[in-house]
Amino acid sequence: MKGNLGDVLQLSVLLSALRELEPQTLDLAGYPARPAPATADVLALADRYLADPFPRYWSLLPTGVGGALIERQWTRRRRRLFSRYDALVCAPGPYLAEYDPRAVSALCDIAVAAELGLPVVLASHSIGPLDERGLAAVRRATVRISREPATHRYLCGRGVSSVLSADLAFLYPYRNVNGAGPIDPPYRLVFLRSNNVDARRLRVAQGKLFEGTRLIADGEREQLVLATSDTRRDAGFLARVARALRLPLVACRSVGELVRLISHSSGVVSDRYHPAICAAVLGKPALVLQNREPHKMEGLQNLLADNSVEELQRLARVGLDTIRGTLRTSI
């Protein structure tokens, strides 16, 4: 809830679907304590927002006494929280992987909820790689919705059942935003995350953007524009890159700004997940850059290459229908 627009896209769809089940209470737990203004539409779909920071330091502790102490404290805290509810729906994301510091607490959450007898729904996830302990925790969930085929293959290949779907952002009700954008066409957008590229190796030559010898984007026929859908994380990094390379930068702070920017572009190059999805739904070419999240980005690349938007939306509905069906029969 820090303002990443991808979270807004997928959570809006998920919470709207959960609302259709007419629960007595629909609470949303997340961080930070004060959500970013961009998340207002998501917050409006929940009855309450519970400030719920995850213990980032846990993943940094060596196994042993320190880690065991944190695990006991976290387990007691989560048991008190989860015992107030009838089901746990884990919000979409790529955090169930051994390289993500959130994984250790998220996997513990699944185990705690399962021990309480609650249905646990992994709603539209990219999962893995995980060690055997992590896979055992994922196996305890009631249902696992894989938002791309790389995760689906990974889980099924290890004997963990999975429902193949597509990201819920494919079902977001995108609307073309009237009015001119901040950049005059023609332009091609480049979305980059600060932890995926080495800024010192970025260069522009003959209208093309490179990282070392790796071609990132070809702007020979149009202007290259740097952009981000997560201003808190990447705006500062991209501002430095933009100054060094003399490229324009647009930091989108709302879904409307993101849609307007992409709808006027000639296409998107992205190592971020949701700008590529937004481009595909709006009918713009989307090139997915591989990064440090192998299942997530490889899976998205395969989805976009092998399916029409209509097929991707059908796949996403399969996941959404599975979530609703699981909750109807389990509660």
Residue positions per predicted region:
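Active-site anion-handling motifs in enzyme catalytic cores
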Residues: 1-331
